[in-house]
Protein backbone atom coordinates (compact mmCIF):
# COMPACT_ATOMS: atom_id res chain seq x y z
CA UNK A 1 0.00 0.00 0.00
CA UNK A 2 2.81 2.41 0.88
CA UNK A 3 4.45 1.60 -2.43
CA UNK A 4 1.20 2.36 -4.26
CA UNK A 5 0.95 5.76 -2.57
CA UNK A 6 4.54 6.51 -3.50
CA UNK A 7 3.83 5.66 -7.13
CA UNK A 8 0.75 7.92 -7.20
CA UNK A 9 2.69 10.86 -5.78
CA UNK A 10 5.56 10.10 -8.10
CA UNK A 11 3.30 10.14 -11.14
CA UNK A 12 1.83 13.51 -10.24
CA UNK A 13 5.29 14.92 -9.49
CA UNK A 14 6.61 13.54 -12.77
CA UNK A 15 3.81 15.16 -14.75
CA UNK A 16 4.51 18.50 -13.13
CA UNK A 17 8.21 18.23 -13.95
CA UNK A 18 7.78 16.90 -17.47
CA UNK A 19 4.57 18.38 -18.93
CA UNK A 20 5.44 17.05 -22.37
CA UNK A 21 4.74 13.49 -21.27
CA UNK A 22 1.35 12.07 -22.14
CA UNK A 23 -0.80 9.02 -21.48
CA UNK A 24 -3.01 9.04 -24.56
CA UNK A 25 -3.56 8.80 -28.27
CA UNK A 26 -1.66 11.82 -29.60
CA UNK A 27 -4.16 14.68 -29.25
CA UNK A 28 -3.36 16.61 -32.43
CA UNK A 29 -3.20 13.51 -34.60
CA UNK A 30 -5.13 10.43 -33.49
CA UNK A 31 -7.64 12.08 -31.14
CA UNK A 32 -8.35 14.76 -33.73
CA UNK A 33 -8.80 12.06 -36.36
CA UNK A 34 -11.14 9.95 -34.26
CA UNK A 35 -13.28 12.94 -33.27
CA UNK A 36 -13.50 14.02 -36.90
CA UNK A 37 -14.72 10.56 -37.90
CA UNK A 38 -17.15 10.33 -34.97
CA UNK A 39 -18.84 13.56 -36.02
CA UNK A 40 -18.84 12.50 -39.67
CA UNK A 41 -20.39 9.14 -38.78
CA UNK A 42 -23.06 10.91 -36.74
CA UNK A 43 -23.82 13.22 -39.68
CA UNK A 44 -23.90 10.36 -42.19
CA UNK A 45 -26.31 8.46 -39.95
CA UNK A 46 -28.80 11.31 -39.49
CA UNK A 47 -31.37 12.46 -42.03
CA UNK A 48 -31.37 16.00 -40.69
CA UNK A 49 -29.75 18.20 -38.08
CA UNK A 50 -26.20 17.77 -39.33
CA UNK A 51 -23.42 19.19 -37.20
CA UNK A 52 -21.93 22.13 -39.08
CA UNK A 53 -18.27 22.32 -40.07
CA UNK A 54 -17.76 25.12 -37.56
CA UNK A 55 -19.24 23.16 -34.67
CA UNK A 56 -17.34 20.06 -35.77
CA UNK A 57 -14.06 21.97 -35.47
CA UNK A 58 -15.06 23.15 -31.99
CA UNK A 59 -15.67 19.57 -30.90
CA UNK A 60 -12.33 18.49 -32.36
CA UNK A 61 -10.58 21.34 -30.57
CA UNK A 62 -12.12 20.25 -27.28
CA UNK A 63 -10.90 16.72 -27.88
CA UNK A 64 -7.37 18.01 -28.41
CA UNK A 65 -7.48 20.26 -25.34
CA UNK A 66 -8.43 17.44 -22.94
CA UNK A 67 -4.74 16.55 -22.83
CA UNK A 68 -3.69 20.08 -21.89
CA UNK A 69 -2.06 20.33 -19.45
CA UNK A 70 -0.71 16.79 -19.42
CA UNK A 71 -1.65 16.33 -15.74
CA UNK A 72 -5.21 15.68 -16.92
CA UNK A 73 -4.03 12.42 -18.49
CA UNK A 74 -3.66 10.86 -15.03
CA UNK A 75 -7.47 10.75 -14.98
CA UNK A 76 -7.82 9.04 -18.37
CA UNK A 77 -7.71 5.44 -17.12
CA UNK A 78 -10.57 3.09 -16.28
CA UNK A 79 -10.20 -0.59 -15.47
CA UNK A 80 -13.80 -1.87 -15.74
CA UNK A 81 -12.94 -5.23 -14.19
CA UNK A 82 -11.77 -3.72 -10.90
CA UNK A 83 -13.62 -0.39 -11.28
CA UNK A 84 -10.51 1.72 -10.69
CA UNK A 85 -8.45 4.36 -12.42
CA UNK A 86 -4.68 4.49 -12.67
CA UNK A 87 -3.12 2.70 -9.67
CA UNK A 88 -6.46 2.74 -7.88
CA UNK A 89 -7.11 6.45 -8.35
CA UNK A 90 -10.40 7.86 -9.65
CA UNK A 91 -11.34 6.56 -13.07
CA UNK A 92 -11.99 8.35 -16.35
CA UNK A 93 -15.67 7.52 -15.91
CA UNK A 94 -15.69 9.35 -12.59
CA UNK A 95 -13.61 12.20 -14.05
CA UNK A 96 -16.17 12.74 -16.81
CA UNK A 97 -18.96 13.20 -14.27
CA UNK A 98 -17.06 14.87 -11.39
CA UNK A 99 -14.35 17.43 -12.14
CA UNK A 100 -11.19 16.85 -10.06
CA UNK A 101 -10.16 20.50 -9.91
CA UNK A 102 -6.57 20.08 -8.69
CA UNK A 103 -5.45 18.45 -11.93
CA UNK A 104 -8.17 19.77 -14.19
CA UNK A 105 -7.29 23.28 -15.25
CA UNK A 106 -6.88 23.76 -18.97
CA UNK A 107 -4.71 26.41 -20.58
CA UNK A 108 -6.18 29.63 -21.96
CA UNK A 109 -7.35 29.48 -25.53
CA UNK A 110 -9.70 31.47 -27.68
CA UNK A 111 -12.18 30.76 -30.42
CA UNK A 112 -13.72 32.88 -33.11
CA UNK A 113 -17.30 31.86 -33.69
CA UNK A 114 -19.51 33.63 -36.23
CA UNK A 115 -17.15 36.59 -36.19
CA UNK A 116 -17.15 36.88 -32.39
CA UNK A 117 -13.98 36.36 -30.35
CA UNK A 118 -14.57 34.22 -27.27
CA UNK A 119 -11.96 33.52 -24.58
CA UNK A 120 -12.26 30.35 -22.50
CA UNK A 121 -10.42 30.59 -19.19
CA UNK A 122 -10.46 30.29 -15.42
CA UNK A 123 -13.41 28.49 -13.87
CA UNK A 124 -14.81 27.92 -17.33
CA UNK A 125 -12.59 24.86 -17.71
CA UNK A 126 -15.10 22.46 -16.12
CA UNK A 127 -16.02 20.14 -18.98
CA UNK A 128 -17.81 17.43 -17.05
CA UNK A 129 -20.97 15.96 -18.53
CA UNK A 130 -23.41 17.75 -16.17
CA UNK A 131 -21.62 21.04 -16.77
CA UNK A 132 -21.64 20.88 -20.56
CA UNK A 133 -25.37 20.10 -20.50
CA UNK A 134 -25.79 23.21 -18.36
CA UNK A 135 -23.70 25.26 -20.79
CA UNK A 136 -25.95 24.18 -23.64
CA UNK A 137 -29.14 24.83 -21.67
CA UNK A 138 -28.09 28.37 -20.77
CA UNK A 139 -27.12 29.26 -24.32
CA UNK A 140 -23.35 28.88 -24.01
CA UNK A 141 -23.10 26.48 -26.91
CA UNK A 142 -19.44 27.22 -27.59
CA UNK A 143 -18.35 25.79 -24.26
CA UNK A 144 -20.89 22.98 -24.61
CA UNK A 145 -19.40 21.79 -27.90
CA UNK A 146 -15.85 22.18 -26.62
CA UNK A 147 -16.89 20.11 -23.62
CA UNK A 148 -18.39 17.44 -25.86
CA UNK A 149 -14.96 17.14 -27.45
CA UNK A 150 -13.38 16.68 -24.02
CA UNK A 151 -15.83 13.85 -23.29
CA UNK A 152 -15.21 12.18 -26.66
CA UNK A 153 -11.47 12.22 -25.92
CA UNK A 154 -12.14 10.11 -22.82
CA UNK A 155 -14.35 7.67 -24.74
CA UNK A 156 -11.61 7.34 -27.35
CA UNK A 157 -9.11 6.55 -24.59
CA UNK A 158 -11.35 3.71 -23.49
CA UNK A 159 -10.49 2.16 -26.85
CA UNK A 160 -6.83 1.88 -25.79
CA UNK A 161 -5.92 -1.33 -23.91
CA UNK A 162 -3.25 0.51 -21.90
CA UNK A 163 -5.97 2.76 -20.47
CA UNK A 164 -8.33 -0.04 -19.52
CA UNK A 165 -5.72 -2.51 -18.23
CA UNK A 166 -4.01 -0.11 -15.78
CA UNK A 167 -0.81 0.10 -17.82
CA UNK A 168 0.80 3.58 -17.61
CA UNK A 169 3.34 4.34 -20.30
CA UNK A 170 5.31 7.50 -19.64
CA UNK A 171 8.53 6.26 -21.18
CA UNK A 172 11.65 4.23 -20.60
CA UNK A 173 14.14 4.60 -17.75
CA UNK A 174 13.98 6.87 -14.73
CA UNK A 175 12.31 9.73 -16.62
CA UNK A 176 9.35 7.46 -17.31
CA UNK A 177 9.39 5.79 -13.90
CA UNK A 178 10.27 2.60 -15.77
CA UNK A 179 6.69 2.39 -17.01
CA UNK A 180 7.84 1.87 -20.59
CA UNK A 181 6.23 3.12 -23.77
CA UNK A 182 3.01 2.09 -25.45
CA UNK A 183 3.73 0.36 -28.78
CA UNK A 184 0.08 0.74 -29.78
CA UNK A 185 -0.13 4.46 -29.06
CA UNK A 186 3.27 5.10 -30.61
CA UNK A 187 2.13 3.33 -33.76
CA UNK A 188 -1.23 5.10 -33.96
CA UNK A 189 0.39 8.46 -33.21
CA UNK A 190 2.75 7.99 -36.13
CA UNK A 191 0.25 6.59 -38.62
CA UNK A 192 -3.26 7.76 -37.71
CA UNK A 193 -4.31 11.40 -38.12
CA UNK A 194 -7.10 13.46 -39.64
CA UNK A 195 -5.79 12.92 -43.15
CA UNK A 196 -5.07 9.19 -42.97
CA UNK A 197 -8.31 8.49 -41.09
CA UNK A 198 -10.48 10.54 -43.43
CA UNK A 199 -13.18 8.31 -44.87
CA UNK A 200 -13.10 5.79 -42.03
CA UNK A 201 -16.57 6.84 -40.89
CA UNK A 202 -18.00 6.19 -44.35
CA UNK A 203 -16.25 2.82 -44.45
CA UNK A 204 -17.74 1.84 -41.09
CA UNK A 205 -21.18 2.96 -42.27
CA UNK A 206 -21.02 0.95 -45.51
CA UNK A 207 -20.30 -2.17 -43.44
CA UNK A 208 -23.72 -1.76 -41.84
CA UNK A 209 -22.64 -0.31 -38.50
CA UNK A 210 -25.08 2.01 -36.74
CA UNK A 211 -24.87 4.57 -33.95
CA UNK A 212 -24.60 2.72 -30.64
CA UNK A 213 -27.56 3.74 -28.49
CA UNK A 214 -27.10 3.39 -24.72
CA UNK A 215 -28.98 4.98 -21.83
CA UNK A 216 -26.19 6.90 -20.10
CA UNK A 217 -22.67 8.26 -20.50
CA UNK A 218 -21.45 5.76 -17.90
CA UNK A 219 -22.76 2.95 -20.11
CA UNK A 220 -20.57 4.13 -22.98
CA UNK A 221 -17.50 4.08 -20.74
CA UNK A 222 -18.35 0.52 -19.69
CA UNK A 223 -19.06 -0.61 -23.24
CA UNK A 224 -15.76 0.64 -24.67
CA UNK A 225 -13.60 -0.18 -21.65
CA UNK A 226 -14.85 -3.76 -21.37
CA UNK A 227 -14.34 -4.33 -25.08
CA UNK A 228 -10.73 -3.12 -25.12
CA UNK A 229 -9.89 -4.71 -21.76
CA UNK A 230 -11.20 -8.17 -22.60
CA UNK A 231 -10.06 -8.48 -26.20
CA UNK A 232 -6.67 -6.78 -26.48
CA UNK A 233 -3.35 -6.59 -24.66
CA UNK A 234 -1.15 -3.69 -23.71
CA UNK A 235 2.60 -4.28 -23.72
CA UNK A 236 2.89 -4.85 -19.97
CA UNK A 237 -0.35 -6.75 -19.42
CA UNK A 238 0.33 -9.80 -21.59
CA UNK A 239 1.94 -11.21 -18.46
CA UNK A 240 1.84 -9.13 -15.30
CA UNK A 241 2.86 -9.99 -11.75
CA UNK A 242 0.70 -7.20 -10.28
CA UNK A 243 -2.65 -8.32 -11.71
CA UNK A 244 -3.30 -10.93 -14.37
CA UNK A 245 -6.51 -10.41 -16.33
CA UNK A 246 -8.39 -13.56 -17.27
CA UNK A 247 -9.02 -12.24 -20.79
CA UNK A 248 -8.17 -12.11 -23.64
CA UNK A 249 -7.10 -15.62 -24.51
CA UNK A 250 -5.33 -16.94 -27.59
CA UNK A 251 -7.70 -19.19 -29.57
CA UNK A 252 -5.05 -20.65 -31.87
CA UNK A 253 -1.40 -20.32 -32.84
CA UNK A 254 0.52 -20.65 -36.06
CA UNK A 255 4.29 -20.39 -36.39
CA UNK A 256 4.31 -16.60 -35.95
CA UNK A 257 1.15 -15.38 -34.21
CA UNK A 258 -1.51 -16.11 -31.65
CA UNK A 259 -5.06 -15.32 -32.77
CA UNK A 260 -8.36 -14.46 -31.13
CA UNK A 261 -11.93 -13.93 -32.33
CA UNK A 262 -13.60 -10.53 -32.08
CA UNK A 263 -16.94 -11.00 -30.24
CA UNK A 264 -18.40 -8.01 -32.11
CA UNK A 265 -17.65 -9.19 -35.64
CA UNK A 266 -16.75 -12.86 -35.35
CA UNK A 267 -13.54 -12.17 -37.26
CA UNK A 268 -10.16 -13.67 -36.42
CA UNK A 269 -7.39 -11.18 -35.67
CA UNK A 270 -3.78 -11.25 -34.55
CA UNK A 271 -3.62 -10.99 -30.77
CA UNK A 272 0.11 -11.53 -30.16
CA UNK A 273 3.38 -12.17 -31.93
CA UNK A 274 4.56 -15.62 -30.88
CA UNK A 275 8.29 -16.34 -30.57
CA UNK A 276 10.47 -18.82 -28.66
CA UNK A 277 13.16 -18.05 -26.11
CA UNK A 278 15.36 -20.91 -27.29
CA UNK A 279 14.45 -23.09 -24.32
CA UNK A 280 11.05 -24.19 -25.54
CA UNK A 281 9.17 -21.37 -23.80
CA UNK A 282 6.69 -19.33 -25.81
CA UNK A 283 7.08 -15.54 -25.68
CA UNK A 284 4.02 -13.42 -26.50
CA UNK A 285 4.37 -9.77 -27.46
CA UNK A 286 2.27 -7.17 -29.26
CA UNK A 287 5.23 -5.79 -31.24
CA UNK A 288 8.67 -7.15 -32.01
CA UNK A 289 11.61 -6.03 -34.17
CA UNK A 290 9.55 -3.54 -36.14
CA UNK A 291 6.65 -5.94 -36.69
CA UNK A 292 3.53 -3.84 -36.08
CA UNK A 293 0.97 -6.14 -37.73
CA UNK A 294 -0.67 -6.95 -34.38
CA UNK A 295 -1.02 -3.24 -33.63
CA UNK A 296 -2.57 -2.72 -37.04
CA UNK A 297 -5.06 -5.53 -36.39
CA UNK A 298 -5.92 -3.95 -33.05
CA UNK A 299 -6.71 -0.65 -34.73
CA UNK A 300 -8.88 -2.34 -37.37
CA UNK A 301 -10.98 -3.92 -34.61
CA UNK A 302 -11.02 -1.02 -32.13
CA UNK A 303 -11.60 1.96 -34.42
CA UNK A 304 -15.15 1.06 -35.58
CA UNK A 305 -16.25 0.59 -31.96
CA UNK A 306 -14.79 3.94 -30.97
CA UNK A 307 -16.65 5.59 -33.85
CA UNK A 308 -20.09 4.03 -33.26
CA UNK A 309 -19.92 4.53 -29.49
CA UNK A 310 -18.58 8.06 -29.90
CA UNK A 311 -21.46 8.88 -32.24
CA UNK A 312 -23.78 7.44 -29.60
CA UNK A 313 -22.35 9.86 -27.06
CA UNK A 314 -23.04 12.72 -29.48
CA UNK A 315 -26.63 11.50 -29.86
CA UNK A 316 -27.00 11.25 -26.08
CA UNK A 317 -25.55 14.73 -25.67
CA UNK A 318 -28.18 16.34 -27.90
CA UNK A 319 -30.98 14.35 -26.27
CA UNK A 320 -30.01 15.24 -22.71
CA UNK A 321 -28.91 18.79 -23.54
CA UNK A 322 -32.26 19.62 -25.16
CA UNK A 323 -34.08 18.15 -22.15
CA UNK A 324 -31.89 20.21 -19.81
CA UNK A 325 -32.58 23.30 -21.92
CA UNK A 326 -36.32 22.73 -21.60
CA UNK A 327 -36.03 22.28 -17.82
CA UNK A 328 -33.90 25.39 -17.53
CA UNK A 329 -36.40 27.53 -19.47
CA UNK A 330 -39.29 26.23 -17.37
CA UNK A 331 -37.36 26.98 -14.17
CA UNK A 332 -36.48 30.47 -15.37
CA UNK A 333 -40.12 31.08 -16.30
CA UNK A 334 -41.23 29.89 -12.85
CA UNK A 335 -38.73 32.20 -11.14
CA UNK A 336 -39.87 35.12 -13.26
CA UNK A 337 -43.54 34.48 -12.49
CA UNK A 338 -42.77 34.25 -8.76
CA UNK A 339 -40.90 37.54 -8.97
CA UNK A 340 -43.85 39.22 -10.67
CA UNK A 341 -46.21 37.91 -7.98
CA UNK A 342 -43.94 39.24 -5.22
CA UNK A 343 -43.65 42.62 -6.92
CA UNK A 344 -47.42 42.89 -7.33
CA UNK A 345 -47.93 41.97 -3.67
CA UNK A 346 -45.44 44.64 -2.59
CA UNK A 347 -47.18 47.25 -4.74
CA UNK A 348 -50.52 46.48 -3.08
CA UNK A 349 -49.10 46.93 0.42
Locations of regions flagged by a protein language model:
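A general boundary/transition motif marking the beginning of the first structured unit of a protein
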Residues: 1-2, 298
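Bacterial N-terminal signal peptides that target proteins for export
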Residues: 2-10
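Bacterial N-terminal signal peptides
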Residues: 10-19
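N-terminal, motif-rich segments that launch catalysis or mediate targeting to/interaction with membranes
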Residues: 22-150, 154-157, 161-332, 336, ...
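Non-catalytic terminal regions with compositionally biased, polar/charged low complexity
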Residues: 347-349
